[in-house]
């Protein structure tokens, strides 16, 4: 029985050693929150939770603080299952539409380690809060199938959109008919651009994250991936200004009419202009001389060619007198 007892102990020890390794493969999910309009007081959370484990309750507090300002006309909740921090670096080019939306937003924060509770759909809680807090009646669920298109809306009513993409393939995996992880991220990025392009106005607030923890290769668990540091470590992002307030600033008073060509300093040329006469005296004299000579020649030609009265008339007159 001793060998069997030792074997059982070895199994227990092996299981205890294996458990941390398996847990190391479970990633806290990354998340992006960005808004077209300025949301005062949100940027402070970036410094407070940057690179720190963010409990789900704290994340919900930040999200509701952003939502409660009710300054957007569309609230978009994007769920990308399987998203990891490494995707923002390794597949940045496949997410360049999302990158541009974040870059041009007035308010944007990122959380790299959101510790969500598995199988807890926090989007439903946030959507319910949004609709209640901002008095929104319309909610649209989009399956996230990039081959499908939904009917765009043109009414200027505040809405909530939820986009649920299918899970991403694992790193290095190729799925028939879908492609690699890079291919799927790029297709989803284009679909997100399509969805955002159907919005009646650009005044949106977007939540982009994975609602489930993903597994990554062991080689990635020890690596540090910052989400687009060129954006989020830029000191100008610490300043709370509305980067998209151009319309309000560029529509004040009416601009007075101004011709394309400014003729205010134009000078009108005349033959009596002294400067013109001084600069072109020789040419003017030559033109006048040629003109006078031409006139004289024409008068002389007329005089030379003038026909004399016919003598035959005089003879007829004399004959009449004789008779």
Curated annotation (Swiss-Prot):
<protein>
    <recommendedName>
        <fullName>Protein BIG1</fullName>
    </recommendedName>
</protein>
<comment type="function">
    <text>Required for normal beta-1,6-glucan synthesis.</text>
</comment>
<keyword id="KW-0472">Membrane</keyword>
<comment type="similarity">
    <text>Belongs to the BIG1 family.</text>
</comment>
<feature type="transmembrane region" description="Helical">
    <location>
        <begin position="282"/>
        <end position="302"/>
    </location>
</feature>
<keyword id="KW-0256">Endoplasmic reticulum</keyword>
<dbReference type="GO" id="GO:0009272">
    <property type="term" value="P:fungal-type cell wall biogenesis"/>
</dbReference>
<keyword id="KW-0732">Signal</keyword>
<dbReference type="GO" id="GO:0071555">
    <property type="term" value="P:cell wall organization"/>
</dbReference>
<feature type="topological domain" description="Lumenal">
    <location>
        <begin position="24"/>
        <end position="281"/>
    </location>
</feature>
<dbReference type="InterPro" id="IPR037654">
    <property type="entry name" value="Big1"/>
</dbReference>
<keyword id="KW-0812">Transmembrane</keyword>
<feature type="glycosylation site" description="N-linked (GlcNAc...) asparagine">
    <location>
        <position position="145"/>
    </location>
</feature>
<dbReference type="GO" id="GO:0006078">
    <property type="term" value="P:(1-&gt;6)-beta-D-glucan biosynthetic process"/>
</dbReference>
<keyword id="KW-0325">Glycoprotein</keyword>
<feature type="topological domain" description="Cytoplasmic">
    <location>
        <begin position="303"/>
        <end position="323"/>
    </location>
</feature>
<keyword id="KW-1133">Transmembrane helix</keyword>
<keyword id="KW-0961">Cell wall biogenesis/degradation</keyword>
<feature type="signal peptide">
    <location>
        <begin position="1"/>
        <end position="23"/>
    </location>
</feature>
<dbReference type="GO" id="GO:0005789">
    <property type="term" value="C:endoplasmic reticulum membrane"/>
</dbReference>
